[in-house]
Amino acid sequence: MNEIASNNIPLKWDVFVAKRQGISRDLPPGKEQLMWVAGSSTLIYGVRDAVLVDTQLTIDHNRALAAWIAKSGKNLTTIYITHGHADHFFGIAELKSLFPNAKAVATPTAVKVMHRQGSPEYLAKFWTPRYPGQLPANPMFAEELKSKVIQLEGHELAPIELGHTDTDHTTCLHVPSIGLVVAGDAAYNDIHLYLAESNEQGRREWIAALDTIEALKPRTVIAGHKVPERDDDPRIIEETRQYIRDFDELARTSDTARELYDRMLELYPNRANPGSLWSSAHAAKG
């Protein structure tokens, strides 16, 4: 657990990380030991109450997440979803079955993305074939957040609009009293970025989003996808930014998706989930 005193009342946070199989599985041979992705869910809590940032994807991982929260003994008041990708909100129903009074909220634009991701058509086309029997049949969606901040025992938790990062209409959650940013997928921590939804303009917008996070001067930055053993140092802001710059440069000077993929692996040989890079390379080069 991590603790920093603020206004004589300690706020704390802890991070639940679960590994699963990545989305892209048709990539070239090699790097088999790295063909996994890990998603993070962050619990921010005070003396009695707690706020969760992002859920997990699969039923089993969300049951484990719910049990982990219950073990903390805290009263879960809010589930904040940073953006509309399914692996960040498909656990809402599972969590509410154990914490029925918790409200799941997100920004209005993020809620719209959720409804696309969780539609029967998108489930049948994209998610269910990749994770058969592992996902909720009828995902529950977040409600639109009506206020500018979330209150937690006298502390303000502020959603920050970031625009496009690994998808459209993303946010982070800033807790200024403890110097914490829960970055969602705006920052990655030793895992290949998902750039398949980001064209050249989108990548510029993602860098601008990282500048926005950096301007908050956080002491801790929790990435939506992180290697469990890695710490949450703010250096991951620049690491993510440099990865995008490198991808941009190599995308301009590579002729094929395979060439771009191989050249990025030369720069980043040890990052987890090369399948994400494979998808990104194909989106950039066809």
Where is each model-derived feature located?
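Zn-dependent metallo-beta-lactamase
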Residues: 1-48
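Pre-active-site segment of Zn-dependent metallo-hydrolases
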Residues: 24-25, 29-38, 48-78
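Active-site neighborhood of phospho(di)ester-bond hydrolases with catalytic His/Asp-centered motifs
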Residues: 53-56, 77-85, 105-108, 181-184, ...
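Metallo-beta-lactamase
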Residues: 4, 112-238, 246, ...
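Accessory terminal helices/loops
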Residues: 2, 215-220, 227-286
